[in-house]
């Protein structure tokens, strides 16, 4: 029997990547229906008659969710939770995202009698690598590290395991690093979009494009996760009994230093950056937070530069992209003074062989931004 997917957060990077993966790599004999949900109208880069959209907000109470979902979830076999509500305040973020998943898992368990698997996407923040230095590369069975803020990923994963006990369906957890990808409705957490806009503005100004970071992070090791690759692993593990009830890290499978990656990315968009970048501030100690300069401050007088560039290239619709960039998010990511990477050895042991050159993942994503009309050439 064909499987039926139920994908939440379908307008986000990971949710839309799963939709595209199923549409582009499977047939109706394998996946008969792809039910997608989001709070806002669904916008996809693919057209497929198997796609069915239902507007859902998992902030709502479980009973109302079940009432809406039971009409379309009778055949659902695989549910993929990719929803996330961003809040700048860590305590508020914990509260809303904890409730979001609790409502989802309670509702899908009641509304989908044929359910076989529920896959939850959390992320590298599960290891608290965004808060302090952690053993690197982080592995799925590393002891939990409890920082100054409650980690809603802990709660979500615990809720998933507890809900599954005694049920016929299995669970999986997917933990990516910083996600590199493009979607029709980007928002401020898209790292690649922010980088692309920064380079294009610097190119327009004829100025150099140094990385807004510190010397230790510049010279340290990093990794990223390409959205289509996340989708590939997600479908791989959720459809194999040998992978049931397991958590998996997912990255591109390579490591890099920003010192050498940043100039290559700049060059791909016609901007200039130097691997011998000089820093005004002294080398920080590991565990400190430091920026040589702030991207969020830098961007404050750059709107007109961006709009003039869009007008000159006949792409007025891309002007709105300026407000979609994550300027402050860039500061948050690049102020770290420690390397934080994930091991994908467990996924390899379970038979997954996915890999993507990280430089190419950025370049392909930049190309897709252009195709979507989000940035000029």
Curated annotation (Swiss-Prot):
Chemical reaction(s) catalysed: dehydrogriseofulvin + NADPH + H(+) = griseofulvin + NADP(+)
Alphabetized Pfam families for the sequence: PRISE
Residues holding NADP(+): 89, 121, 226, 266, 268
Gene3D superfamilies documented for this protein: NAD(P)-binding Rossmann-like Domain
SUPFAM superfamilies per UniProt: NAD(P)-binding Rossmann-fold domains
Pathway(s) the chain acts in: Secondary metabolite biosynthesis; terpenoid biosynthesis
Record keywords, A-Z: NADP, Nucleotide-binding, Oxidoreductase
Active site feature: 226
GO molecular function: nucleotide binding; oxidoreductase activity
Biotechnology: Griseofulvin is a spirocyclic fungal natural product used in treatment of fungal dermatophytes.
EC nos: 1.-.-.-
Observed phenotype of the null mutant: Impairs the production of griseofulvin, but accumulates the intermediates dehydrogriseofulvin and dechloro-dehydrogriseofulvi.
Keyword NADP: yes
Keyword NADP part of the UniProt annotation: yes
BP-aspect Gene Ontology terms: griseofulvin biosynthetic process; terpenoid biosynthetic process
Function according to Swiss-Prot or TrEMBL: Short chain dehydrogenase; part of the gene cluster that mediates the biosynthesis of griseofulvin, an important antifungal drug that has been in use for a long time for treating dermatophyte infections. The first step of the pathway is the formation of the heptaketide backbone by gsfA which is initiated by priming with acetyl-CoA, followed by sequential condensations of 6 malonyl-CoA units. The resulting benzophenone can undergo a spontaneous dehydration to form norlichexanthone.
Family membership: Belongs to the short-chain dehydrogenases/reductases (SDR) family. Highly divergent.
Protein name as catalogued: Short chain dehydrogenase gsfE
Protein source organism: Penicillium aethiopicum
Gene name of this polypeptide: gsfE
């Amino acid at each position: 029997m064909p499987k039926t997917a139920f994908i939440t957060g379908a307008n986000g990077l990971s949710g839309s990547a799963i939709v595209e993966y199923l549409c582009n790599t499977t047939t109706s004999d394998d996946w008969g229906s792809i039910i997608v949900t989001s709070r806002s109208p669904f916008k996809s880069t693919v057209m497929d008659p198997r796609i069915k959209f239902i507007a859902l907000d998992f902030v709502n109470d479980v009973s109302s969710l079940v009432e809406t979902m039971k009409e379309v979830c009778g055949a659902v076999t695989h549910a993929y939770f990719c929803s996330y509500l961003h809040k700048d305040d860590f305590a508020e973020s914990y509260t809303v995202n904890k409730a979001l998943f609790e409502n989802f898992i309670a509702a899908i368990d009641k509304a989908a009698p044929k359910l076989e698997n529920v896959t939850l996407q959390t992320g590298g923040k599960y290891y608290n690598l965004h808060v302090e230095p952690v053993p690197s590369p982080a592995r799925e069975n590393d002891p939990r590290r409890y920082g100054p803020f409650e980690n809603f990923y802990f709660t979500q994963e615990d809720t998933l395991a507890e809900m599954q006990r005694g049920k016929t369906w299995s669970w999986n957890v997917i933990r990516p690093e910083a996600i590199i990808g493009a979607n029709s409705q980007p928002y401020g957490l898209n790292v690649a979009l922010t980088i692309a806009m920064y380079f294009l503005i610097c190119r327009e100004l004829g100025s150099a494009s140094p990385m807004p970071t510190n010397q230790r992070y510049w010279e340290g090791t990093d990794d990223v996760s390409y959205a289509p690759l996340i989708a590939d692993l997600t479908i791989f593990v959720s459809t194999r009994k040998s992978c049931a009830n397991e958590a998996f890290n997912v990255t591109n499978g390579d490591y890099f230093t920003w010192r050498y990656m940043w100039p290559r990315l700049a060059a791909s968009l016609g901007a200039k950056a130097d691997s011998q970048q000089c820093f005004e501030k002294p080398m920080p100690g590991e565990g400190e937070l430091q920026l040589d300069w702030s991207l969020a401050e830098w961007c404050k007088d750059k709107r007109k530069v961006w709009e003039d560039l869009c007008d000159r290239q006949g792409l007025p619709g891309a002007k709105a992209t300026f407000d979609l960039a994550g300027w402050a998010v860039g500061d948050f990511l690049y102020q770290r003074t420690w390397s934080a990477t994930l091991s994908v050895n467990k996924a390899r042991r379970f038979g997954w062989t996915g890999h993507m050159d990280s430089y190419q993942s950025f370049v392909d994503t930049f190309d897709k931004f252009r195709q979507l009309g989000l940035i000029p050439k």
